[in-house]
């Protein structure tokens, strides 16, 4: 990727994320992006033909827990300290959309 494409990509992602980045932040993220892509290239060079895929590994330890309901707070307790609540829901300022 060229620097221009990387810069354009970072600016596009920032815009989609509603972020305003300074020029030096764009440069920093561009360098980090290059480092990540370079690392991925190195990973792609690794010979894994004799390595079992992860899904074939046998893991003896039980990694799932039983789904047992536990006590929780009521809706009223959850919103009692909220600055604003309406109809049992938190009221928060709009963060996306119109500027």
Swiss-Prot record:
Top EC class for this record: ligase
Entry keyword annotation includes Magnesium: no
EC number per UniProt: 6.3.5.-
One Pfam family this sequence matches: GatC
Keywords noted in UniProt: ATP-binding, Ligase, Nucleotide-binding, Protein biosynthesis
A single GO molecular function term of this UniProt record: ATP binding
Gene Ontology biological-process annotations: glutaminyl-tRNAGln biosynthesis via transamidation; regulation of translational fidelity; translation
UniProt-listed InterPro entries: Asp/Glu-ADT_sf_sub_c (IPR036113), GatC (IPR003837)
Substrates-to-products reaction catalysed: L-glutamyl-tRNA(Gln) + L-glutamine + ATP + H2O = L-glutaminyl-tRNA(Gln) + L-glutamate + ADP + phosphate + H(+); L-aspartyl-tRNA(Asn) + L-glutamine + ATP + H2O = L-asparaginyl-tRNA(Asn) + L-glutamate + ADP + phosphate + 2 H(+)
NCBIfam families recorded: gatC
Similarity remark: Belongs to the GatC family.
Subunit comment: Heterotrimer of A, B and C subunits.
Function description: Allows the formation of correctly charged Asn-tRNA(Asn) or Gln-tRNA(Gln) through the transamidation of misacylated Asp-tRNA(Asn) or Glu-tRNA(Gln) in organisms which lack either or both of asparaginyl-tRNA or glutaminyl-tRNA synthetases. The reaction takes place in the presence of glutamine and ATP through an activated phospho-Asp-tRNA(Asn) or phospho-Glu-tRNA(Gln).
Protein name (record): Aspartyl/glutamyl-tRNA(Asn/Gln) amidotransferase subunit C
Gene for this chain: gatC
